[in-house]
């Protein structure tokens, strides 16, 4: 039986950008369900969505209750076995879903790809997540996620629907500040970390099939420009602390063991290109 895949596009006041996300979702080389979840947009987003007719499912809520509520609303309305959360300012290559599905197995928790960061005005995009490709031990990726200040984005990953519903938390206990409740900062990291508890392996496609747009209103760029990067990093530290409280969680390797793990990871990534 062919796996069913749903692409969820949460959006808020980005009518100008969301069309690219929708167009690339609809152009996938395998059939997908596309759900656009709009919480409280006051721009032309409803009109933009209407142009696609029955090719997409448009969920409209009049109240904006924050990113994480919008993400979950979209995921809860999917019918696929697998889901991809595609932020409204990002997009994926037409082969993204097909290539990710090829690496899924019963013991693989999720699949993610490399990504390109596009800065308006820059001729060449930066490739990120140069990690070793293929199916690999989950413990390797967990060490990376515990070590790095900023996480892998769900925008370059494919998850099982049941895992997304279980592990995309409405909020993180202890989270506070501007990146606390309902911001999605930390919840995105925990989607990976909590899912890792149930699977021995993950998979990585060593091709940049996801595309992220760096612009003033994107969360990472705005954190840097507003002097709140430390608060952003702290929010992810709270998420890691929550993960470490869970049964079966992995402690971060430190000292010589941590240095060796990091070195081996980087070498494998360089060999992969």
Where in this protein do the model-derived segments appear?
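Conserved donor NDP-sugar-binding/catalytic core segment of glycosyltransferases
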Residues: 95-128
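A conserved acidic beta->alpha catalytic loop
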Residues: 24, 38-47, 63, 87
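Short aromatic/hydrophobic "clamp" motif used to bind/position activated sugar donors
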Residues: 83
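Acidic helix N-cap motif at the loop->helix transition within catalytic regions
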Residues: 16-19, 43-51, 91, 95
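Glycine-rich, basic loop-to-helix element that forms the pyrophosphate-binding segment
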Residues: 61-78
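Conserved nucleotide-sugar donor-binding catalytic segment
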Residues: 135-225
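Short, acidic, metal-binding catalytic loop of nucleotide-sugar glycosyltransferases
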Residues: 23-32
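N-proximal low-complexity "stem/linker" segments adjacent to membrane-targeting elements
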Residues: 1-24
């Amino acid at each position: 039986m062919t796996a069913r895949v749903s692409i969820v596009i949460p959006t808020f006041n980005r009518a100008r950008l969301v069309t690219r996300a929708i167009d690339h979702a609809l152009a996938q080389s395998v059939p997908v369900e596309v759900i656009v979840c709009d919480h409280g947009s006051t721009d032309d987003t409803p009109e933009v969505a209407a142009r696609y007719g029955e090719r997409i499912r448009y969920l409209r809520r009049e109240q904006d209750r924050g990113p994480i509520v919008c993400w979950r609303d979209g995921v809860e309305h999917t019918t696929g076995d697998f889901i991809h959360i595609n932020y409204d300012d990002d997009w994926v290559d037409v082969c993204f879903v097909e290539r990710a599905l090829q690496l899924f197995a019963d013991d693989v928790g999720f699949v993610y790809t490399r990504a390109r960061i596009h800065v308006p005005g820059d001729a060449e995009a930066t490739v990120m997540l140069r990690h070793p490709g293929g199916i690999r031990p989950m413990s390797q990726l967990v060490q990376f996620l515990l070590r790095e200040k900023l996480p892998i984005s769900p925008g370059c990953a494919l998850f099982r629907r049941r895992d997304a519903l279980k592990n995309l938390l409405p909020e993180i206990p202890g989270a506070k500040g501007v990146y606390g409740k309902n911001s999605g900062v930390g919840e995105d990291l925990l989607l990976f970390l909590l899912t890792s508890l149930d699977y021995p392996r993950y998979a990585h496609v060593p091709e940049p099939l996801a595309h992220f747009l760096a612009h003033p209103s994107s969360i990472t760029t705005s954190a840097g420009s507003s002097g709140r990067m430390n608060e952003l990093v702290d929010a992810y530290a709270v998420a890691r602390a929550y993960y470490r409280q869970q049964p079966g969680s992995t402690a971060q390797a430190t000292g010589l063991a941590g240095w060796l793990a990091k070195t081996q990871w980087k070498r494998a990534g360089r060999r992969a290109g």
